[in-house]
Amino acid sequence: MLALNNYLIISAILFSIGTIGVLVRRNAIVIFMCVEMMLNAVNLTFIAFSKYLGNIDGQIFVFFVMTVAAAEAAVGLALMIAFFKNRESIDVEDVNIMKW
């Protein structure tokens, strides 16, 4: 059985990898996957504290975060598909639709 520190270290590593991926990558799909990795790292932290403290609140909150992540995935992928149909690219450098 792992201690709380081990779960928190794994979660921090996953969150750091996701943050670096968001900051370094140019492909919108890869950035999107890195954001999802960051959300899963937060979920792991909630589960670890929920288990450590012995209450179920963290696990319930994880279900809400997963629901929001699923909605984010649906909307994000729909936006990427629409952008790809218009520009035939999903690089974030090509996103200048919002410019005046």
Curated annotation (Swiss-Prot):
E.C. code: 7.1.1.-
Coiled coil: none
Swiss-Prot/TrEMBL keywords: Cell inner membrane, Cell membrane, Membrane, NAD, Quinone, Translocase, Transmembrane, Transmembrane helix, Transport, Ubiquinone
Chain segments annotated as transmembrane: 4-24, 29-49, 60-80
InterPro entries hit by this protein: NADH_UbQ_OxRdtase_chain4L/K, NUOK/Mnh_C1-like
Signal peptide: none
Cell membrane recorded as keyword: yes
Biological process annotations from GO: ATP synthesis coupled electron transport
Catalytic activity: a quinone + NADH + 5 H(+)(in) = a quinol + NAD(+) + 4 H(+)(out)
Pfam family, one: Oxidored_q2
Keyword Membrane attributed: yes
Membrane topology: Multi-pass membrane protein
Molecular functions (GO terms): NADH:ubiquinone reductase (non-electrogenic) activity; quinone binding
Cellular compartment(s): Cell inner membrane
GO cellular component, one term: NADH dehydrogenase complex
Family, per entry: Belongs to the complex I subunit 4L family.
Subunit annotation: NDH-1 is composed of 14 different subunits. Subunits NuoA, H, J, K, L, M, N constitute the membrane sector of the complex.
Known function: NDH-1 shuttles electrons from NADH, via FMN and iron-sulfur (Fe-S) centers, to quinones in the respiratory chain. The immediate electron acceptor for the enzyme in this species is believed to be ubiquinone. Couples the redox reaction to proton translocation (for every two electrons transferred, four hydrogen ions are translocated across the cytoplasmic membrane), and thus conserves the redox energy in a proton gradient.
Name of the molecule in the record: NADH-quinone oxidoreductase subunit K 1
Organism: Geotalea daltonii (strain DSM 22248 / JCM 15807 / FRC-32) (Geobacter daltonii)
Lineage: Bacteria, Pseudomonadati, Thermodesulfobacteriota, Desulfuromonadia, Geobacterales
